[in-house]
């Protein structure tokens, strides 16, 4: 088939996806995915993208799963609320994060299928977070303790997000606890977290110094050429990639027919230039998407990214980032270790 693809929260801009006359677009095959979702007014792109990557990885293996972001959001908010309570309101509740945080929460709390706990379409996570903080401040003033706090939180979450599923979930006739289901979705050590910066030695792991790395996840540091090779190899062998990077660039805010490029002044993209962008704070950890394919346009490589801003954005929820854009603006990538062998 011929493919024309046109802050973390949903942006209302619409991307035109008409291929310019005279452009040569090479045919491509996209990795199979679950339906595009819409994170709405929430900063949960990291959860949507990492779950989407896991879902596509399972589809590739002949297994179909569709996972609940709402469950993770609820578990995270409850945990953050307890931290807020014990800090006497000095530790703010933030729902931002990085892709590996999703794995952290799955390992800790398990996961449930999307059908067991769906996203409510009209919920505003920013408003819910403020309600949680208000509830916690009252709890601090009253010194009610954790059990009563959790009881009040659960009533709030039930009202705003819907009632939690039973302690066991059912999938293809089998019965699982959320923890057991999580082990079937993402076993420990299944994914590798990768980055590429020169202020730490290559070949070593370090906690990325980004504000959203709340759980201090560590990433394997590799040269950018090697990171790009890992991404290409994964995609060419049918494995999705969870991409995390900067979308504040002019090329992303105003893509040309759904294709995103760096500015001519930013070429060539090198290890040194991406380090300068990061250290000058021009490359920031803005957004997370799932890479599901590669495409060649006028003999230049682009990576097809599945977003979480609904299927009315871009080309049915997708956009193409150039290889130079990835080289310059990637913060991190999460890839199945099977794809790295």
Task: Give the predicted meaning of each segment.
Residues 1-20:
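Bacterial Sec-dependent N-terminal signal peptides
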Residues 40-54, 93-100, 287:
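Active-site nucleophilic cysteine motif
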Residues 11, 29, 151-341:
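Active-site signature of cysteine proteases
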Residues 67-175:
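Papain-like cysteine protease catalytic cores
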Residues 57-69:
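Phosphate-handling active-site elements
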Residues 18-29, 76:
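Active-site-adjacent bridging/hinge elements
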């Amino acid at each position: 088939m011929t493919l024309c693809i046109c802050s973390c929260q949903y942006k209302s801009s619409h991307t035109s996806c008409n291929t310019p006359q005279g452009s040569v677009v090479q045919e491509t095959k996209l990795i199979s995915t679950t339906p595009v979702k819409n994170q709405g007014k929430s900063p949960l792109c990291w959860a949507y993208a990492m779950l989407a990557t896991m879902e596509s990885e399972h589809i590739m293996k002949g297994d179909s799963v569709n996972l609940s972001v709402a469950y993770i959001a609820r578990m995270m908010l409850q945990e953050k609320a307890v931290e807020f309570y014990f800090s006497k309101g000095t530790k703010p509740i933030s729902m931002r994060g990085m892709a590996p945080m999703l794995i952290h929460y799955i390992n800790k709390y398990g996961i449930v299928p999307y059908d067991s706990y769906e996203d409510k379409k009209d919920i505003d996570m920013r408003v819910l977070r403020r309600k949680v903080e208000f509830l916690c401040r009252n709890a601090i003033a009253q010194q009610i303790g954790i059990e009563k706090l959790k009881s009040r939180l659960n009533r709030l979450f039930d009202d705003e997000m819907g009632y939690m599923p039973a302690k066991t979930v059912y999938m293809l006739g089998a019965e699982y606890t959320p923890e057991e289901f999580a082990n079937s979705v993402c076993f420990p050590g299944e994914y590798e977290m990768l980055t590429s910066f020169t202020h730490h030695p290559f070949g070593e792991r370090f906690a990325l110094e980004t504000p959203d790395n709340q759980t201090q996840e560590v990433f394997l540091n590799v040269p950018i050429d090697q990171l790009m090779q890992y991404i290409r190899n994964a995609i060419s062998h049918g494995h999705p990639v969870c991409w995390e990077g900067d979308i504040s660039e002019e090329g992303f805010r105003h893509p040309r027919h759904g294709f995103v490029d760096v500015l001519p002044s930013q070429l060539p993209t090198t290890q040194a230039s991406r380090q300068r962008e990061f250290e000058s704070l021009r490359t920031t950890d803005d957004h997370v998407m799932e890479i599901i394919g590669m495409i060649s346009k006028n003999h230049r490589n682009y990576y097809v990214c599945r977003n979480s801003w609904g299927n009315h954005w871009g080309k049915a929820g997708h956009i193409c980032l150039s290889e130079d854009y990835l080289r310059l603006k990637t913060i991190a990538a999460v890839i199945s270790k099977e794809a790295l062998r």
